[in-house]
Amino acid sequence: LEFVLNKIRNYWGGMLDRGAVTFWEEFDPEAPVETQYDMYGDRFGKSLCHAWAASPIYFLAKYFMGLKFTGVGGKEFVVEPHTEFFDSFDCTLPVAEGQVHIVWDGNELKVEKTAHRLDL
C-alpha cells in the first residue's frame, strides 16, 4: 500500500502541484512546465479532465478508506480504513441508496451512512 500511496502522491500530486483541479489524460512529472499540455503534436492537445486518469479515486476508496462491499448491490459493506498512512482524512463515498462519510482526525474514527430520501 505504501508504494501505491507514494505513486499517487508523486504522480497525481504532481498534477496538483502544477495547478490541476482535475486529472489529466497524461502527465510526465519530468516534463518542463512549458510543455505540460502538449500531446498528439498539438501544443494544447491534452485533455485536462480525463476519466482514465482517475484511478487514484478507486484506490483511495477501496484500499485506503477500506470500503468493502459485502452484499449484492452495495447495500451491505464494511469500512476498515488504513489510518496509519494519514494524519487525518475526510472522505465521502457513494453506496447503495446513499453515501458513507468516513472521518479520521488523528485520534478518532467516525463512520456515518446517510440515506438518500426518495419522495415519490
Model-derived features with residue positions:
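Non-catalytic C-terminal accessory modules of carbohydrate-active enzymes
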Residues: 2-120
